[in-house]
From Swiss-Prot:
Modified residue annotations for Phosphothreonine: T273, T393, T554
Residue positions, PTM Phosphoserine: 257, 263, 267, 271, 275, 284, 302, 327, 335, 355, 378, 387, 407, 469, 492, 494, 590
Function: Antiviral protein which inhibits the replication of viruses by recruiting the cellular RNA degradation machineries to degrade the viral mRNAs. Binds to a ZAP-responsive element (ZRE) present in the target viral mRNA, recruits cellular poly(A)-specific ribonuclease PARN to remove the poly(A) tail, and the 3'-5' exoribonuclease complex exosome to degrade the RNA body from the 3'-end. It also recruits the decapping complex DCP1-DCP2 through RNA helicase p72 (DDX17) to remove the cap structure of the viral mRNA to initiate its degradation from the 5'-end.
Name the UniProt record assigns to this protein: Zinc finger CCCH-type antiviral protein 1
Database matches in Pfam families: HTH_53, PARP, WWE, WWE_4, zf-CCCH_8, zf-CCCH_PARP12
Subunit comment: Homodimer or homooligomer. Homooligomerization is essential for its antiviral activity. Interacts with EXOSC5. Interacts (via N-terminal domain) with DDX17 in an RNA-independent manner. Interacts with EXOSC3, EXOSC7, DCP2 and DCP1A. Interacts with PARN in an RNA-independent manner. Interacts with XRN1 in an RNA-dependent manner. Isoform 2 interacts (via zinc-fingers) with RIGI in an RNA-dependent manner. Interacts (via N-terminal domain) with DHX30 (via N-terminus) in an RNA-independent manner.
Stretch list, region Binding to EXOSC5: 224-254
CDD domains reported for this sequence: TCCD_inducible_PARP_like (cd01439)
Segments forming domain WWE: 594-681
Induction record: By type I interferon (IFN) and viruses. Isoform 2 is up-regulated by 3'-PPP-RNA.
GO molecular function: cadherin binding; RNA binding; zinc ion binding
Posttranslational mods: Phosphorylation at Ser-275 is essential for sequential phosphorylation of Ser-271, Ser-267, Ser-263 and Ser-257 by GSK3-beta. Phosphorylation by GSK3-beta enhances its antiviral activity.
Any one GO cellular component localisation term in the record: late endosome
Length: 902
């Protein structure tokens, strides 16, 4: 028997991270070795921990999902002895209509951790969980928390009584499957909780795709225990395979996980069925010989297509590149059509649970397939398809057919507000700067859904490897040279393709080299990263070659605007949502996210997060709009969480309202009203002139004309340096004024050998309002702290506050934030700029509750507001949210050298 305290602690950690973690990430949170942890998980069994494996040619990644046998009693009034929890499930999730003062009106108990409930939790070894952690665990373990299942639903392909108008709002899935007691290995009812319609209903009831994914994996595990795989019965004793509709990880289309991937030969012996979305009006798989299906399984192993991230628990889809698989294509009615010859549905490898100490490596099912892969796929594809494996919405297809977009002009098209003309130019760049971008290798690529509405390429890694891989965005799988569309494009664009384009089978990193951008890479030709003259790079896949676009700055400018998702380039249309140029995949290479690098890193990508209001306007998080209270989270905070947990859900507040933001679904949900808003993540635009200026040195003043043209066209640049709209007032204080005396004395306390030239007061009502609101929330007085920086940043700071992306110091050992000093001399000595061009800001800073910092921190630990160098008598304060800071004064000073008599 596993140690109850250890199991409870592991469950607590998992629930604090959304109910699921990669095994490697879990090992970092506990003081156990890997063999010890594996033994605990095995002894505890799948009723406590479901262990999943995602495998590929690069290796195996294991994930752990928390579950429990504890259940909530469904009776309104339970008078008899009961081993279940008695509580209000809506209150547990923070959604009960009765407030705390009205809890007596609710039919269910609001005492989550009552004495009776505590006994039940103790019996299930869960007494150490708090309310929030218990909510996570029960939500993915107890089917009582799921929406109602339709009682009229009889299964796919059978006569259904359910014909409600409007369509049924209940779940059409197997009720027994959710309870873990379905006795049919080939059940006629659907076991696919990741079906589009099911997900939509789940979302309406507050269950985001992350939670549904965990429920799917837990139910799959129970079903495998109930129906262990064995020798297949004769066909006469099996149900018609055409109507099977279960989802055992391999049947997931948008995400999924594979539990202990088996070999192809073993998998071929098990039933391999399509999901409910695929099987209507199709021939039975019984018609296809087993040997033929087995051969097709082996052919699908190592094609030039994507596989799910090895760091996640998503399904290894052997059918193609998208999470839906290239063996399917979505038609306008939402159905899917197979691209396999003689196969009426997609085929997936089956998998079995094995004991933790005996986790086995992948069987080599990917060998000897390259020469035969063309026999699996149809030689022709519909023109409406964006690429082989890149699915395209009917909206995108219809839009491209519109004659208004197929102009010779280069223009950016805003979906609702018309078009914005931009200078025309050739489609591709002949003279791209930098070495060839060898973005993919002979192994398959990894794809995952992104917050930008498309997919990203990521290299095989443990749970949360380098963030740069998340910023390389692309769709579609690698097209074969024999694709007839490639020849068509090559005929028309052969004279403009780049000579430095990269082959898809080259080996290289997806990350643009920061050293090359800043001061020159010391590794030169041996550097594994991409060398390019901009922190972003746009390319299009033609055949097996990634070709650079010309005028990348113009494409980037459109992409950075959250309201723009289509732009036309000559006779071609770029769709930022699906990352395609007509029927060809495109991608955006990028530098790493700014929150993952030290504060003094230059040219990292700063991502901005937006939500869409009722009028269709994209609002930046943390920004006040239409006199509404701004949210208590901003882009830097969200980006930090996204980089550490890209499948997570973030709770936050805006005024008195509570919300949840799902990274995977990119949806913001009002917890009370259940209304949802779209969310998007786009980078801050960095013009080429700024890159050149930073290479020359940050003290060089930029051309003022550039900022006018940029801010007039693109709203996302409000946080970008030098793009100020003069929304502040800077006034010099007279040297006899008491305010001048107070500030100067504070400055000279540590700067005795320096002379003050001027002290100017900053007045910015917008920044002051945000600071005042934050101050009222934290209920504390601010400290007067110092921050030395380049004179070139005065306008940016006065207008938009401090920014760790641009206004950096050499330090980062206490966290990746903004460094303020108690003594001015400390900030002066740590300023990385020429002393002749340095100014000193005096800021009001809300340090709040602080703890000792760490170089890995991108935000303060929970329950803390800032980080310091030492807790006893701190002299350095690291702030991660700029609303905790208000720049109040700026001091111009020079060194007062002593007179020397010779």
């Amino acid at each position: 028997m596993a140690d109850p305290e250890v199991c409870c602690f592991i469950t607590k950690i998992l629930c604090a991270h959304g109910g699921r973690m990669a095994l490697d990430a879990l090992l970092q949170e506990i003081a156990l070795s890997e063999p010890q942890l594996c033994e605990v998980l095995q002894v505890a069994g799948p009723d406590r921990f479901v262990v999943l494996e995602t495998g590929g040619e690069a290796g195996i990644t294991r994930s752990v999902v928390a579950t429990t046998r504890a259940r909530v009693c469904r009776r309104k009034y339970c008078q008899r002895p009961c081993d279940n929890l008695h509580l209000c499930k809506l209150n547990l999730l923070g959604r009960c209509n009765y407030s705390q003062s009205e809890r007596n009106l609710c039919k269910y108990s609001h005492e989550v951790l009552s004495e009776e409930n505590f006994k039940v939790l103790k019996n299930h070894e869960l007494s150490g969980l708090n309310k929030e952690e218990l909510a996570v665990l029960l939500l993915q373990s107890d089917p009582f928390f799921m929406p109602e299942i339709c009682k009229s639903y009889k299964g796919e392909g059978r006569q259904q009584i359910c014909n409600q108008q409007p369509p049924c709002s209940r779940l059409h899935i197997c009720d027994h499957f959710t309870r873990g007691n379905c006795r049919f290995p080939n059940c006629l009812r659907s076991h696919n909780l990741m079906d589009r319609k099911v997900l939509a209903i789940m979302r309406e009831h507050g269950l985001n795709p992350d939670v549904v994914q965990n429920i799917q994996d837990i139910c799959n595990s129970k079903h495998m225990q109930k129906n262990p795989p064995g020798p297949r019965a004769p066909s006469s004793h099996r149900r018609n395979m055409a109507y099977r509709a279960r989802s055992k990880s391999r049947d997931r289309f948008f995400q999924g996980s594979q539990e202990f991937l088996a070999s192809a030969s073993a998998s071929a012996e098990r039933s391999c069925t399509p999901s409910p979305d695929q099987i209507s009006h199709r021939a039975s798989l019984e018609d296809a010989p087993v040997d033929d299906l087995t051969r097709k399984f082996t052919y699908l192993g190592s094609q030039d297509r994507a596989r799910p991230p090895s760091g996640s628990s998503k399904a290894t889809d052997l059918g193609g590149t998208s999470q839906a698989g290239t063996s399917q294509r979505f038609l306008e009615n939402g159905s899917q059509e197979d691209l396999l010859h003689g196969n009426p549905g997609s085929t997936y490898l089956a998998s079995n649970s094995t004991s933790a100490p005996n986790w086995k490596s992948l069987t080599s099912w990917t060998n000897d397939q390259g020469a035969r892969r063309k026999t699996v796929f149809s030689p022709t594809l519909p023109a409406a398809r964006s690429s082989l494996g890149s699915l395209q919405t009917p909206e995108a297809v219809t839009t491209r057919k519109g004659t208004g977009l197929l102009s010779s002009d280069y223009r950016i098209i805003n979906g609702k507000s018309g078009t914005q003309d931009i200078q025309p130019g050739p489609l591709f760049n002949n003279n791209a700067d930098g070495v060839a971008t060898d973005i993919t290798s002979t192994r398959s690529l990894n794809y995952k859904s992104t917050s930008s509405g498309h997919r990203e390429i990521s290299s095989p890694r443990i749970q949360d490897a380098g963030p740069a891989s998340r910023d390389v965005q692309a769709t579609g799988r690698i097209a074969d040279d024999a694709d007839p569309r490639v020849a068509l494009v090559n005929d028309s664009l052969s004279d403009v393709t780049s000579t430095t384009s990269s082959r898809v089978d080259d080996h290289d990193s997806e990350e643009i080299c920061l050293d090359h951008l800043c001061k020159g890479c010391p590794l030169n030709g041996s550097c594994s990263k991409v060398h390019f003259h901009l922190p972003y790079r746009w390319q299009m896949l033609i055949g097996k070659t990634w070709t650079d676009f010309e005028h990348m700055e113009t494409i980037e400018k459109g992409y950075c605007n959250p309201g723009i998702h289509l732009c036309s380039v000559g006779s071609y249309t770029i769709n930022f949502r699906v990352m395609s140029c007509d029927s060809f995949p495109i991608r955006r290479l990028s530098t790493p996210s700014s929150v993952t690098k030290p504060a003094n890193s230059v040219f990292t990508t700063k991502w901005i997060w937006y939500w869409k209001n009722e009028s269709g306007t994209w609002i930046q998080y943390g920004e006040e709009k239409d006199k509404r209270k701004n949210s208590n989270v901003d882009s830097s905070y969200l980006e930090s969480l996204y980089q550490s947990c890209p499948r997570g859900v973030v709770p936050f507040q805006a005024g008195s309202r509570n919300y949840e933001l799902s990274f995977q679904g990119m949806i913001q949900t009002n917890i009370a009203s259940k209304t949802q808003k779209d969310v998007i993540r786009r980078p801050t635009f960095v013009p080429q002139w700024y890159v050149q200026q930073m290479k020359r040195g940050p003290d060089h003043q930029p051309a003022k004309t550039s900022s006018v043209s940029l801010t007039a066209t693109f709203r996302p640049q409000e946080d970008f340096c030098f793009l100020s709209s003069k929304k502040y007032k800077l006034s010099e204080i007279h040297h006899l004024h008491p305010e001048y005396v107070r500030v100067s004395e504070h400055f000279k306390a540590s700067m005795k050998n320096f002379k003050i030239e001027k002290i100017k007061k900053i007045e910015n009502s917008e920044l002051l309002d945000k600071f005042t609101w934050k101050k009222s929330q934290m209920k504390e007085e601010g400290k007067l702290l110092f921050y030395a920086t380049s004179r070139a940043y005065v306008e940016s700071i006065c207008s938009n506050n401090f920014d760790s992306f641009l206004h950096e110091t050499h330090e980062n050992k206490y966290g990746k934030g903004i460094y303020f000093a108690k003594d001015a001399i400390y900030s002066h000595k740590n300023c990385p700029y020429d002393a002749k061009n340095v100014v000193m800001f005096v800021a009001q800073v809300l340090v709040g509750k602080f703890t000792e910092g760490n170089i890995t921190y991108t935000s303060p630990p929970p329950q803390f507001d800032s980080c310091v160098d030492t807790r006893s008598n701190p002299s350095v304060f690291v702030i991660f949210q700029k609303d905790q800071v208000y720049p109040q004064y700026v001091i111009e000073y020079t060194e007062d050298k002593a007179c020397v008599i010779s």
